[in-house]
């Protein structure tokens, strides 16, 4: 297959691949939140122990909303001039880093 036929067959799939990637990330964050909730309800540390699970749920929700926005942006033709989600990626990366720190701190208690 040459480059032109690959590009022609790939037309429109960028939005689906992007949505799948963001959705997988959201699902991983959601599973993290569920596992933290199960661990913390078993340990009965009180409501403060559920903070990491809440953060994971919030990060998963944000990630899913970003996935929907990205799919909508990439489905427009012609593509918008700026299609990189820099601000969204920074927000989500910060949320994941905060989640990691809070989870690590909660595990130490």
From Swiss-Prot:
Coiled coil: none annotated. The lineage of its organism: Bacteria, Bacillati, Actinomycetota, Actinomycetes, Mycobacteriales. Signal peptide: none annotated. Disulfide bonds: none annotated. It is a multi-pass membrane protein. One of its GO terms (cellular component) is plasma membrane. Keywords: Cell membrane, Membrane, Transmembrane, Transmembrane helix. It comes from Mycobacterium bovis (strain ATCC BAA-935 / AF2122/97). This is Uncharacterized protein Mb2296. Pfam families: DUF202. The chain crosses the membrane at residues 18-38, 48-68. It is found in: Cell membrane.
């Amino acid at each position: 297959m040459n480059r032109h036929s690959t590009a022609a067959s790939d037309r429109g799939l960028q939005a689906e691949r992007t949505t799948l990637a963001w959705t997988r990330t959201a699902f991983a964050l959601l599973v993290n939140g569920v596992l933290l909730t199960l661990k913390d309800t078993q340990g009965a540390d009180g409501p403060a122990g559920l903070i990491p699970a809440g953060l994971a749920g919030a990060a998963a929700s944000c990630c899913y909303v970003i996935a929907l926005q990205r799919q909508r942006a990439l489905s427009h033709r012609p593509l918008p001039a700026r299609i990189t989600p820099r601000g969204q990626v920074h927000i989500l990366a910060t949320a994941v880093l905060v989640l990691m720190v809070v989870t690590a701190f909660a595990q130490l208690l």
